[in-house]
Amino acid sequence: MAGMYNQDGGGGAPIPSYGGDGYGGGGGYGGGDAGYGGRGASGGGSYGGRGGYGGGGGRGNRGGGGGGYQGGDRGGRGSGGGGRDGDWRCPNPSCGNVNFARRVECNKCGALAPSGTSSGANDRGGGGYSRGGGDSDRGGGRGGRNDSGRSYESSRYDGGSRSGGSYGSGSQRENGSYGQAPPPAAAIPSYDGSGSYPPPTGYGMEAVPPPTSYSGGPPSYGGPRGGYGSDAPSTGGRGGRSGGYDGGSAPRRQEASYEDAATEKVKQCDADCDDNCDNARIYISNLPPDVTTDELKDLFGGIGQVGRIKQKRGYKDQWPYNIKIYTDEKGNYKGDACLAYEDPSAAHSAGGFFNNYEMRGNKISVTMAEKSAPRAPTFDQRGGGRGGGGGGYGGGGGDRRRDNYSSGPDRNHHGGNRSRPY
C-alpha cells in the first residue's frame, strides 16, 4: 500500500497529482513502515516515513515517534513505536532469536541485524503534545488526530513537505518542548500540485529551541514550576505541587517551650500561709554530723506521717522514707536535711514543735523548705501519638507516670506503636 492517499510510499512510486505529501505519506498502513508519516524515503528502510527526524516514523521501524507525549511512548521506548511491530528475527539459522526493534545485533548470538531493520533508537521524534502524530497504524505514538502533517508545529520547512511533526518537534530534537502554549493552527495545504506548505507563522524556519530547564510537564499534567523550593503556582489539569516538598504549605506549628513563658517568682511559705498551701517539705539545719535517717523519722514522725518514696525495682528498700541528708563532696554529712510529710499541715506545724530543739548538744533549726518552680511537662516526642493532643501515647499530654517520683515504666504505655500480640 505504498500509495495510500495518493502518496509516494516506498521506493520510487510516482508523485501523485494531489500535491506531494498530501495527508498521508510514506506507506499508509503497510508500505514503507511509516504509518502516516509523510514521504517515506526508500520504503521500510532506514528513514521510514520522511520523518525520521521527528515525524512519522522514527528511523525505520513501523511506529516511530510522531505525536504523542515525547515521541511514541512518552520517550520510554525510543522510536520503536508502540508494541512489538519492529522486532526482527536473527538471520543466523542456528539461532532464530527474536530481537527488539531497537537492537542492531542479535541479543543471543551477536549477528548483525538484516538490512532494513535498523532502528533509530535515538531519533524519537520530538515528542511533545501533538495533534498530528504520525504513525497511527501499528500502535504508534499517542498523538491526536493522525493528520501527519497538520501538527501544531512543523519543525522543518524544506520546500516539499513538512515532517509529520509533533508539537514542538525539531529535526532530530530529542525531547520536545513540554508545556508551551500552542501556536495558531497550521494553514490548510494548497492543492496546487506543488505539494508545498507555507511555513507556520510566528515561528520562523528553525526548530523550537529546547527548554532551558526540564521542569515542566505536558500541559495537562501541570508539572512543578521552579523546582523544589519555590512557591510558584502550578498550572495544568492535574495540579502538580507548587514548589515540591512543603512548597507553599503552612509552616509546622512551633510548640512554645516551657522556658519561653515568663518565669514568675514562686511564692514561698511564710506566716500567712493558709490551708490551701500544698508545701509538705521542711528544711532542717544544724544537725549533728552523725545523724541518721531513722532518728529524723522517729523525731519528726511524732506529729505526722513522714512520706515515702516508691523506689524502682532492684533496691533493697522499696519504700524508703522521704528524707534527704545532704553530704559534701567526700560523702560526709553537712548537718542539714530535708524531710517531706504526707500532710502539708504537718509540715507547717513542724517549726513550732522542733525549732531550736536540742539534739546531742546541737540546737536544730526547722523551717519550711523553699518551693521550686513547677517542672515542665514531659511531652512525648511523637507529638501526641495515636490519640493526638499533646504528648503521650493516647493524647492528653502531661506526665503519664503514676506518681511524681520516677516510678519506673508505665505498664499502660506499651512502648510506642508496637503491636501487642494479646
UniProtKB/Swiss-Prot annotation:
Residue span, RRM domain: 280-371
Tissues/organs with expression: Expressed in roots, leaves and inflorescences.
The keyword Nucleus is assigned to this record: yes
Record's keyword terms, sorted: Activator, Metal-binding, Nucleus, RNA-binding, Transcription, Transcription regulation, Zinc, Zinc-finger
Zinc finger residue extent: RanBP2-type: 84-115
One GO MF term: zinc ion binding
Function: TAFs are components of the transcription factor IID (TFIID) complex that is essential for mediating regulation of RNA polymerase transcription.
Subunit details: Component of the TFIID complex. TFIID is composed of TATA binding protein (TBP) and a number of TBP-associated factors (TAFs) whose MWs range from 14-217 kDa. Interacts with TAF4, TAF4B, TAF5, TAF12B and TAF14.
Listed name of the protein: Transcription initiation factor TFIID subunit 15b
Originating gene: TAF15B
